[in-house]
UniProtKB/Swiss-Prot annotation:
E.C. no: 5.1.1.3
Gene Ontology biological-process entries: cell wall organization; peptidoglycan biosynthetic process; regulation of cell shape
Role: Provides the (R)-glutamate required for cell wall biosynthesis.
Family membership noted in the UniProt record: Belongs to the aspartate/glutamate racemases family.
Pathway where this protein functions: Cell wall biogenesis; peptidoglycan biosynthesis
Reactions that this protein is recorded to catalyse: L-glutamate = D-glutamate
S-S pairs: none
Active site residues of this protein: 76, 186
UniProt name for this protein: Glutamate racemase
Length: 264
Protein backbone atom coordinates (compact mmCIF):
# COMPACT_ATOMS: atom_id res chain seq x y z
CA UNK A 1 0.00 0.00 0.00
CA UNK A 2 1.33 3.43 -0.99
CA UNK A 3 2.31 5.99 1.66
CA UNK A 4 2.39 9.79 1.68
CA UNK A 5 6.17 9.89 2.05
CA UNK A 6 6.82 7.93 -1.14
CA UNK A 7 8.19 9.73 -4.18
CA UNK A 8 6.70 11.03 -7.40
CA UNK A 9 8.41 9.64 -10.51
CA UNK A 10 8.72 11.75 -13.67
CA UNK A 11 10.32 10.63 -16.91
CA UNK A 12 11.18 11.95 -20.34
CA UNK A 13 13.55 11.10 -23.17
CA UNK A 14 15.83 13.90 -21.99
CA UNK A 15 15.61 17.45 -20.65
CA UNK A 16 12.04 18.20 -21.72
CA UNK A 17 10.35 16.82 -18.63
CA UNK A 18 12.13 19.40 -16.47
CA UNK A 19 9.46 21.84 -17.71
CA UNK A 20 6.87 19.65 -15.99
CA UNK A 21 9.05 19.15 -12.92
CA UNK A 22 9.43 22.92 -12.48
CA UNK A 23 5.64 23.39 -12.40
CA UNK A 24 5.31 20.53 -9.90
CA UNK A 25 7.99 21.90 -7.58
CA UNK A 26 6.26 25.30 -7.58
CA UNK A 27 2.91 23.78 -6.58
CA UNK A 28 4.04 20.76 -4.54
CA UNK A 29 7.41 21.79 -3.04
CA UNK A 30 7.26 19.30 -0.15
CA UNK A 31 7.07 16.21 -2.34
CA UNK A 32 10.13 14.06 -3.07
CA UNK A 33 10.80 13.52 -6.79
CA UNK A 34 12.77 11.15 -8.96
CA UNK A 35 13.44 12.44 -12.47
CA UNK A 36 14.47 9.83 -15.04
CA UNK A 37 16.00 11.33 -18.18
CA UNK A 38 16.46 8.60 -20.78
CA UNK A 39 18.90 10.66 -22.84
CA UNK A 40 20.97 7.57 -23.61
CA UNK A 41 18.05 6.45 -25.80
CA UNK A 42 17.21 9.94 -27.11
CA UNK A 43 15.37 10.79 -29.32
CA UNK A 44 12.06 9.02 -28.73
CA UNK A 45 10.20 11.00 -31.39
CA UNK A 46 11.92 9.68 -34.50
CA UNK A 47 13.46 6.34 -35.42
CA UNK A 48 11.76 4.21 -32.76
CA UNK A 49 8.76 1.89 -33.11
CA UNK A 50 5.78 1.79 -30.78
CA UNK A 51 6.98 -1.56 -29.45
CA UNK A 52 10.47 -0.23 -28.74
CA UNK A 53 9.00 2.74 -26.87
CA UNK A 54 6.76 0.46 -24.82
CA UNK A 55 9.73 -1.67 -23.77
CA UNK A 56 11.87 1.36 -22.88
CA UNK A 57 9.11 2.91 -20.79
CA UNK A 58 8.26 -0.39 -19.09
CA UNK A 59 11.87 -0.56 -17.88
CA UNK A 60 11.57 2.98 -16.52
CA UNK A 61 8.36 2.10 -14.65
CA UNK A 62 10.12 -0.91 -13.14
CA UNK A 63 12.82 1.49 -11.93
CA UNK A 64 10.21 3.75 -10.31
CA UNK A 65 8.49 0.83 -8.58
CA UNK A 66 11.84 -0.39 -7.19
CA UNK A 67 12.56 3.15 -5.98
CA UNK A 68 9.36 3.52 -3.99
CA UNK A 69 7.27 5.85 -6.16
CA UNK A 70 3.58 6.42 -5.33
CA UNK A 71 2.68 8.02 -8.67
CA UNK A 72 4.31 8.35 -12.09
CA UNK A 73 4.08 11.17 -14.62
CA UNK A 74 4.84 10.41 -18.26
CA UNK A 75 6.36 13.82 -19.04
CA UNK A 76 6.96 12.94 -22.68
CA UNK A 77 4.27 13.30 -25.34
CA UNK A 78 5.83 10.63 -27.57
CA UNK A 79 5.98 8.08 -24.74
CA UNK A 80 2.46 9.03 -23.68
CA UNK A 81 1.21 8.44 -27.23
CA UNK A 82 3.00 5.12 -27.64
CA UNK A 83 2.78 3.55 -24.21
CA UNK A 84 0.34 5.07 -21.70
CA UNK A 85 -2.34 2.39 -22.11
CA UNK A 86 0.29 -0.35 -22.17
CA UNK A 87 1.85 0.91 -18.92
CA UNK A 88 -1.49 1.25 -17.17
CA UNK A 89 -2.25 -2.39 -17.96
CA UNK A 90 1.14 -3.51 -16.61
CA UNK A 91 1.39 -1.42 -13.43
CA UNK A 92 -1.07 -0.73 -10.61
CA UNK A 93 0.24 2.65 -9.41
CA UNK A 94 -1.40 5.85 -10.78
CA UNK A 95 0.12 6.98 -14.11
CA UNK A 96 -0.60 10.47 -15.43
CA UNK A 97 -0.15 11.07 -19.17
CA UNK A 98 0.65 14.39 -20.79
CA UNK A 99 -1.45 13.97 -23.95
CA UNK A 100 -4.66 13.87 -21.89
CA UNK A 101 -3.47 16.96 -20.03
CA UNK A 102 -2.71 18.73 -23.32
CA UNK A 103 -6.17 18.07 -24.74
CA UNK A 104 -7.79 19.19 -21.47
CA UNK A 105 -5.92 22.50 -21.27
CA UNK A 106 -6.57 23.20 -24.97
CA UNK A 107 -10.27 22.51 -24.47
CA UNK A 108 -10.34 24.94 -21.52
CA UNK A 109 -8.62 27.73 -23.47
CA UNK A 110 -9.98 27.60 -27.02
CA UNK A 111 -12.92 29.84 -27.85
CA UNK A 112 -13.72 28.33 -31.27
CA UNK A 113 -12.65 24.66 -30.83
CA UNK A 114 -9.86 24.98 -33.45
CA UNK A 115 -6.44 24.13 -32.06
CA UNK A 116 -2.98 23.34 -33.40
CA UNK A 117 -0.40 21.06 -31.80
CA UNK A 118 3.33 21.15 -32.48
CA UNK A 119 5.05 17.89 -31.56
CA UNK A 120 7.56 15.23 -32.56
CA UNK A 121 7.16 13.21 -35.74
CA UNK A 122 5.95 10.14 -33.81
CA UNK A 123 3.27 12.02 -31.85
CA UNK A 124 1.97 13.78 -34.97
CA UNK A 125 1.98 10.73 -37.25
CA UNK A 126 0.37 8.56 -34.55
CA UNK A 127 -2.33 11.24 -34.11
CA UNK A 128 -1.78 11.23 -30.36
CA UNK A 129 -3.74 14.44 -29.86
CA UNK A 130 -6.44 13.84 -32.47
CA UNK A 131 -7.23 10.41 -31.04
CA UNK A 132 -7.31 11.63 -27.45
CA UNK A 133 -9.45 14.63 -28.45
CA UNK A 134 -12.06 12.28 -29.93
CA UNK A 135 -12.35 10.67 -26.49
CA UNK A 136 -12.18 13.78 -24.30
CA UNK A 137 -13.71 16.58 -26.41
CA UNK A 138 -15.11 15.42 -29.74
CA UNK A 139 -15.85 19.01 -30.82
CA UNK A 140 -12.15 19.91 -30.97
CA UNK A 141 -10.64 20.30 -34.45
CA UNK A 142 -6.97 19.38 -34.15
CA UNK A 143 -4.17 20.23 -36.59
CA UNK A 144 -1.02 18.25 -35.75
CA UNK A 145 2.31 19.64 -36.93
CA UNK A 146 5.50 17.55 -36.74
CA UNK A 147 8.50 19.74 -35.89
CA UNK A 148 11.02 17.04 -36.72
CA UNK A 149 14.25 18.75 -35.63
CA UNK A 150 13.11 20.74 -32.60
CA UNK A 151 13.57 18.26 -29.72
CA UNK A 152 17.10 17.34 -30.88
CA UNK A 153 18.04 21.02 -31.29
CA UNK A 154 16.71 21.93 -27.83
CA UNK A 155 18.35 18.91 -26.19
CA UNK A 156 21.77 19.78 -27.64
CA UNK A 157 21.56 23.59 -27.41
CA UNK A 158 18.87 25.57 -29.26
CA UNK A 159 20.85 28.83 -29.45
CA UNK A 160 23.74 27.13 -31.25
CA UNK A 161 21.65 26.49 -34.39
CA UNK A 162 21.73 29.32 -36.94
CA UNK A 163 18.69 27.94 -38.79
CA UNK A 164 16.38 27.96 -35.76
CA UNK A 165 14.39 31.04 -36.85
CA UNK A 166 13.98 29.66 -40.35
CA UNK A 167 12.65 26.35 -38.98
CA UNK A 168 10.34 28.12 -36.52
CA UNK A 169 8.82 30.13 -39.36
CA UNK A 170 8.48 27.00 -41.50
CA UNK A 171 6.54 24.98 -38.93
CA UNK A 172 4.52 27.77 -37.35
CA UNK A 173 3.32 28.83 -40.81
CA UNK A 174 1.43 25.50 -40.92
CA UNK A 175 -0.91 26.63 -38.11
CA UNK A 176 -4.39 27.05 -39.64
CA UNK A 177 -5.69 30.62 -39.86
CA UNK A 178 -8.76 29.72 -37.77
CA UNK A 179 -6.80 28.11 -34.89
CA UNK A 180 -6.93 30.20 -31.71
CA UNK A 181 -4.82 27.97 -29.44
CA UNK A 182 -1.42 26.29 -29.87
CA UNK A 183 -0.47 23.33 -27.67
CA UNK A 184 3.21 22.73 -26.95
CA UNK A 185 2.97 19.01 -27.68
CA UNK A 186 6.51 18.11 -26.65
CA UNK A 187 7.85 18.87 -23.18
CA UNK A 188 11.05 20.28 -24.72
CA UNK A 189 9.13 23.11 -26.39
CA UNK A 190 8.38 25.26 -23.29
CA UNK A 191 12.16 25.77 -23.16
CA UNK A 192 11.80 27.85 -26.36
CA UNK A 193 8.35 29.24 -25.61
CA UNK A 194 9.53 32.84 -25.84
CA UNK A 195 10.79 32.30 -29.40
CA UNK A 196 7.54 30.57 -30.38
CA UNK A 197 5.35 33.34 -28.95
CA UNK A 198 7.32 36.01 -30.84
CA UNK A 199 6.23 34.41 -34.11
CA UNK A 200 2.48 33.93 -33.55
CA UNK A 201 -0.47 35.90 -32.22
CA UNK A 202 -2.60 33.05 -30.81
CA UNK A 203 -2.68 31.68 -27.25
CA UNK A 204 0.08 29.18 -26.40
CA UNK A 205 -0.66 26.54 -23.76
CA UNK A 206 1.63 24.16 -21.88
CA UNK A 207 0.14 20.82 -20.72
CA UNK A 208 2.40 20.92 -17.64
CA UNK A 209 -0.08 23.26 -15.92
CA UNK A 210 -2.83 20.66 -16.28
CA UNK A 211 -0.44 17.89 -15.17
CA UNK A 212 -0.01 19.69 -11.84
CA UNK A 213 -3.78 19.91 -11.35
CA UNK A 214 -4.22 16.22 -12.14
CA UNK A 215 -1.38 15.26 -9.82
CA UNK A 216 -2.89 17.22 -6.93
CA UNK A 217 -6.36 15.76 -7.61
CA UNK A 218 -5.02 12.19 -7.80
CA UNK A 219 -2.88 12.41 -4.65
CA UNK A 220 -5.68 14.14 -2.72
CA UNK A 221 -8.24 11.50 -3.71
CA UNK A 222 -5.86 8.73 -2.60
CA UNK A 223 -4.86 10.62 0.59
CA UNK A 224 -1.22 10.56 -0.58
CA UNK A 225 -0.23 14.25 -0.51
CA UNK A 226 3.01 14.58 1.46
CA UNK A 227 2.24 16.75 4.49
CA UNK A 228 5.80 17.21 5.76
CA UNK A 229 6.89 20.83 6.31
CA UNK A 230 10.38 20.82 4.77
CA UNK A 231 11.10 21.03 1.03
CA UNK A 232 11.35 17.74 -0.80
CA UNK A 233 14.41 16.07 -2.28
CA UNK A 234 14.84 15.79 -6.06
CA UNK A 235 17.11 13.12 -7.51
CA UNK A 236 17.97 12.90 -11.21
CA UNK A 237 18.93 9.71 -12.99
CA UNK A 238 20.09 9.83 -16.62
CA UNK A 239 21.08 7.08 -19.03
CA UNK A 240 23.38 9.29 -21.13
CA UNK A 241 25.72 12.24 -20.67
CA UNK A 242 25.54 14.59 -17.69
CA UNK A 243 28.01 17.30 -18.83
CA UNK A 244 25.34 19.15 -20.86
CA UNK A 245 22.23 17.85 -19.09
CA UNK A 246 23.28 18.98 -15.60
CA UNK A 247 24.07 22.68 -16.28
CA UNK A 248 21.08 23.06 -18.62
CA UNK A 249 18.66 21.57 -16.06
CA UNK A 250 20.22 23.67 -13.27
CA UNK A 251 19.90 26.88 -15.28
CA UNK A 252 16.24 26.18 -16.07
CA UNK A 253 15.29 25.08 -12.54
CA UNK A 254 17.39 27.77 -10.85
CA UNK A 255 19.11 25.37 -8.45
CA UNK A 256 21.86 22.78 -8.21
CA UNK A 257 20.72 19.22 -8.87
CA UNK A 258 21.69 15.83 -7.51
CA UNK A 259 22.34 13.64 -10.55
CA UNK A 260 23.49 10.07 -11.21
CA UNK A 261 24.23 8.23 -14.43
CA UNK A 262 22.75 4.74 -14.81
CA UNK A 263 23.00 2.10 -17.59
CA UNK A 264 20.66 2.61 -20.53
Amino acid sequence: MAEKTQRIGIFDSGLGGTTVLKELINSLPNEDYIYYGDNGNFPYGSGKTKNELQKLTERILDFFVKNNCKLVIVACNTASTAAIDYLREKFSLPIIGIIEAGVKIASKNTKNKNIAVISTKFTAESHGYKNKAKMLDSELNVKEIACIEFAQMIETGWDTFDNRKELLNKYLSEIPKNADTLVLGCTHYPLIREDIEKNIKIKVVDPAVEIVERTIQTLTSLNLLNDKKERGRIIFFVTGETYHFKPTAEKFLGKEIEIYRIPK
